[in-house]
């Protein structure tokens, strides 16, 4: 069970421990930009450990991209080939989901309709987006992140209605006044002239 690193107390783990573990599960020597470690108990009992690689996965824009999430049940490995574990626009996320509430003999068909897993996924997406919001407070770090993952984040606006308010704060745009910098929608609106009533934009296919 990969020694269930994600079950260890967060306070006992250092940044190097997380980086070493990320490299061991991803074969990515560039390291991770951030990690998101959650240990939930209560209505649902599960652990998740997600990483955002510093560099976008090579197959991120391939239709047959490989899932980056490994599913465990009670520390027993189940699958690393289920794209339903994370929304398509977060396909660059790497990591582990480990549930204590699912039966070990669960089938793929049941997994896709399972309420427990659906709730874990929903909670995880919110947690990941919250971390992106924290990252966005540091303009330099967020620029580094957005350069790699800006396009998938924009896809989220079309795919994830539940989290659209957060996603609209995360997307960035180039404007005729911003030169090479990207700015948030909120900043664009704030900088509009008083007499400007319309926003014009160009889309690319």
Sequence positions of predicted segments:
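Conserved GHKL (Bergerat-fold) ATPase module
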Residues: 1-205
């Amino acid at each position: 069970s990969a020694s269930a690193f994600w079950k260890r107390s967060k306070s006992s783990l250092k940044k190097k421990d997380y980086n070493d573990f990320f490299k061991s599960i991803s074969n990515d020597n560039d390291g991770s930009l951030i990690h998101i470690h959650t240990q939930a108990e209560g209505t649902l009992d599960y652990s998740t450990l997600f990483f955002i690689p510093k560099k976008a996965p090579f197959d991120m824009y391939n239709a047959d991209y490989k899932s980056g999430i490994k599913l465990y049940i009670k520390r027993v490995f189940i699958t690393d080939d289920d794209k339903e574990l994370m929304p398509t626009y977060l396909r660059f996320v790497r990591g582990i989901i480990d549930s204590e509430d699912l039966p070990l003999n669960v089938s793929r068909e049941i997994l896709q309709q399972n309420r427990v897993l659906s709730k874990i996924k929903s909670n995880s997406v919110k947690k990941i987006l919250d971390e992106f919001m924290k990252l966005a407070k540091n303009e330099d770090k967020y620029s580094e992140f957005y350069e790699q993952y800006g396009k998938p984040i924009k896809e989220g606006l079309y795919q994830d209605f539940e989290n659209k308010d957060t996603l609209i704060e995360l997307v960035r745009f180039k404007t005729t006044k911003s030169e090479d910098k990207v700015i948030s929608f909120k900043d664009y609106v704030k900088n509009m002239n008083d007499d400007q009533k319309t926003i014009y934009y160009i889309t690319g296919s």
